[in-house]
């Protein structure tokens, strides 16, 4: 199964997040979703929205 370019991390993106290196701290009020479907030693962080 090959995903389309840019859609490699569907689970993370569905939650509105992006993959970051594991060392990055997700600063509140961002959410840290953990690894999700990001690559090894990365994690999914959702940056706070402007709403």
Curated annotation (Swiss-Prot):
Disulfide bonds join 12-44, 19-38, 26-45. Monomer. Keywords: Antimicrobial, Disulfide bond, Ion channel impairing toxin, Myotoxin, Neurotoxin, Potassium channel impairing toxin, Secreted, Signal, Toxin, Voltage-gated potassium channel impairing toxin. Residues 1-8 form the signal peptide. Expressed by the venom gland. SUPFAM superfamilies: Defensin-like. It holds the Pfam family Myotoxins. Coiled coil: none annotated. Belongs to the crotamine-myotoxin family. One of its GO terms (molecular function) is toxin activity. This is Myotoxin-4. Its main location: secreted. The lineage of its organism: Eukaryota, Metazoa, Chordata, Craniata, Vertebrata. Gene3D superfamilies: Anthopleurin-A. GO terms for biological process: envenomation resulting in occlusion of the pore of voltage-gated potassium channel in another organism. It comes from the Eukaryota. One of its GO terms (cellular component) is extracellular region. Cationic peptide that possesses multiple functions. It acts as a cell-penetrating peptide (CPP), and as a potent voltage-gated potassium channel (Kv) inhibitor. It exhibits antimicrobial activities, hind limb paralysis, and severe muscle necrosis by a non-enzymatic mechanism. It is found in: Secreted.
